[in-house]
Amino acid sequence: MSPTHLINRVSILGTGLIGGSFALALRKYTEGIHITAWDRRDTVARAKDLGAADEIFSGELKPAIENADLIYVALPISTTLDILPEIARHSPQHALVTDACSTKVRIVRAAEELFSGSGEKLFLGGHPMAGKELSGIANADANLFRGTTYALVGESSSNADDEAVRHSSPEADPLTSPARSMPTGTIKEDPRVVAFLKIIAKIGARPLWLGAQQHDYAVGLASHLPQLAAVALASFLYDHLDENGLPIALAGPGLRDTLRLAGSPYSTWRDIVLTNREVLSAGLDLFARRLDELRDKLASRELEADFDAANELYKLLRSF
């Protein structure tokens, strides 16, 4: 039997942008997978109307997951932490459970405690680096994952990383402490994980294995800090609007591109900020220092070096 066939029944918990897009991607790029969706009644009804689910549930969780081969948790971080114990109790022994949360340290640590004594059940941390500034099932897209990186944090590849988190000094700077590369563990060879990796490839994403702390450090700088920078600039400009709509009345495409992330709702970011606040706090301090340095260079040609570095980073970003 092909490893892909180990995953015939998928239960998706949360059918917002990510969960809904994953369901639509399964529909478009795989064959023969039965999709069950669990969420609020109106949301799962919409998912079924869009063809993203064969079977829908709201309310009690057990019926939605008790026959699943893959349980895909696409819920907010706090909700995921609350629901993990119930998933551990009611998921079948053969099931692979994975999440799509934007931070990983707390999720992986909780899952290790819950699933370590649950027989053959397996948890695999995940984070698809895909999204939009708009949320909800109405904005779900079967092609959302194409060309993106899919971060994976497995149990055996994150233990040492999380031990480092537990035993590090409280005063340690999360940005100056070196990020740790995690050893490869046997979780990669588990047939269920192999099957899930095949699904990731079919929906167009590239897997990247790393540790939980390493993940949160990287996304803190590359994803969460840019969001806060966009919020800061947008709220600053909002506070300086005059009766003629200036300065926004003279804004061009550059400002719209820069502030695209400012359209994201706080409800999407609340849990992310709370669970990655140490990295973000340190990152904001260093970023504020960089802004001070730029201000001091305004009257000199020294800004050229900063522009050159920015150009190189932009070129590098386009290569990923």
Language-model features, listed with the residues they occupy:
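Interdomain hinge/lid region at the active-site interface
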Residues: 244-311
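Rossmann-like NAD(P)-binding element
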Residues: 61-91, 95-98, 102
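Phosphate-coordination loops involved in phosphoryl transfer and adenosine-cofactor binding
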Residues: 6-9, 94, 147
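NAD(P)+-binding Rossmann beta1-loop-alpha1 motif at the extreme N-terminus of oxidoreductases
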Residues: 2-59, 63-66, 70
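Internal alpha-helical scaffold of NAD(P)-dependent oxidoreductase catalytic cores
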Residues: 145-165, 174, 185-260
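Rossmann-like NAD(P)(H) cofactor-binding subdomain of soluble oxidoreductases
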Residues: 86-138
